[in-house]
């Protein structure tokens, strides 16, 4: 497995698409998620007759982290013989603030989780800060990624969302 970070953007210095196409095949170039739209995936032949999986992650640090969690980590788990989606716990939570996004793209919003004092066993999801793909502070504060479905323009405070826990990994 070869993982490149910062070479899959759409800018002038993004060489991953060209290189992956030269050494093997490029099977995927973009995904409809913020953060993380530029994502390259392909494979290249190895000298022993096998193949090497190629991943090109976006250049913005938050985008790179999110695409790694969603696309690369499950592949690495599968290659180790583990359940590809068993590594991260998912939980339901209630948003404490509104989220706006473009319709047509599933969004992964950095949130801080807090147990709901009024309802034991329930979680509240607070926005971890500004949500730009370059804002590392929100990622550093986050312990979850709230999933906002692609068919909505966002979610209001009080909406129930699914959250991928970043603070807990299960076997």
Regions found by a protein language model. Name each.
Residues 1-22:
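N-terminal small/polar loop signature for handling phosphorylated ligands or for N-terminal nucleophile
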Residues 19-171:
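Flexible glycine/proline-rich
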């Amino acid at each position: 497995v070869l993982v490149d970070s910062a070479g899959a953007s759409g800018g002038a210095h993004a060489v991953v698409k060209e290189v992956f196409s030269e050494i093997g095949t490029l099977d995927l170039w973009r995904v409809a998620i913020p953060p993380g739209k530029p994502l390259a995936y392909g494979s290249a032949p190895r000298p022993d007759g096998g193949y090497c999986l190629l991943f090109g992650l976006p250049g913005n640090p938050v985008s790179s982290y999110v695409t790694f969690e969603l696309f690369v980590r499950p592949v690495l788990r599968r290659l180790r013989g583990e359940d590809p989606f068993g590594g991260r716990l998912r939980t339901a939570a209630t948003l404490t603030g509104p989220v706006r996004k473009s319709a047509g793209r599933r969004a992964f919003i950095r949130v801080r989780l807090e147990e709901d004092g009024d309802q034991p066993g329930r979680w509240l999801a607070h926005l971890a800060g500004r949500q730009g793909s370059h804002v590392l502070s929100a990622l550093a504060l986050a312990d979850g990624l709230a999933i906002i479905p692609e068919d909505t323009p966002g979610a209001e405070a009080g909406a129930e969302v699914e959250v991928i826990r970043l603070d807990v990994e299960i076997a």
